[in-house]
């Protein structure tokens, strides 16, 4: 079958062995790649009810048929496992250039199982698997680790994926980084690697994916670049990146702030995209094969962090620290972003937990010097979390156990154990549905449904028939994650273009109905994984605070409206009203 190596590699770090197996045409047609492939492999290999930190929990790296192709937005890889944060299905994606190196090792998927008794770093190539001692790397931050390995590995342009001290200490929202600042950020992938004593995985090789129409792919990519290089979407991402959302959400009243008690901040000009342009000298930074260049390489120009350089901050980091924690200087947000990157922490979970800790301190539940707009106090807490010191040890296990231990479930904001992104569902009702039913917990990326609600495609307050558009967006995003192509190209790659990309890479002809069937099958697979791990329909719901408390302007999301949205979603998915699958 074109577009695949038709091979998966399983690495067992317990006995330092590896095994290659064939992937059949029928198997690949059923799941395609990326999310479809990673999810199916998890279903097939993971024992039901396995502890996420057990050696038997598999960590899957999956690629798609678009990987290492000329298609714009195709340099991405996915990671899949049972999350230590939620205890459920876990997926995360990253860009950069690592996916190309992974593909050239000659496999469609890499499965890691077992656990080492001492730190290791893995080298995976088209020549085999090599297990290297990593005692000298253990304790290094993510940047230090990648720098050492770039000097140590002789191969040209290796893909280097690393964890930081947070992953080593199994902080349940630890990240996996590559290419300096590209991140598989959510649901604790880094903690799973850390539990297996794996500090890094390095990929390289020289194999090329056999596409159905290699010349056609080049022509297609050239055509799309000419058509869209000056498009409004391209210019918006290139000029402002995701921080453009700060002003948009703040104006809409849906910018979560002061730990979900407000929908806007007063001095937004201190933390928006304009503040980055004025004070951080941003330069566009793109993943390989991408013309959007949504990333921004910044350098702080003045103040105590003068000279600090990083790629970011993204909108979600600004929301987490600038909104929830009320940090009102972009330079301080850059500082906290850099600290999280170095330690290997998810910035979204970190900001949510820091703001939760502020509220816990104000309520007398914890003894900790921390308050809003105090970046040094927030930084000190993040370091405690990584080291699992004092209250940091409690917060390192996530918002759900922390809120239960402190008796603060009524104010804790999460779905299935994962904290939401920066779109308040009391303003954007479709995002309420997104958070409620997303397979990995409160996630905005499974549908990116903030886009139609903010752009006027559909009224944010509409309930009737909203689920139909929602499912359409979710299906298309699922296919992006299955190919794998960056979902920021959603405005440039409509349904027919997805079919065109599949035809050029795999040779398979798929009409819209075929694509919808594939997307639904992948969605059902993730649902099946969650159901067997104990998911109930009551888990497809929003936290008490978002349902019981209105924003200061009076806007709220009613429980009956959320019930209607979820029920409509179940029906359109063909699920039972209990959230179970028909089969």
Which sequence ranges carry the predicted segments?
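Intrinsically disordered, low-complexity segments enriched in small residues
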Residues: 1-93, 97-583
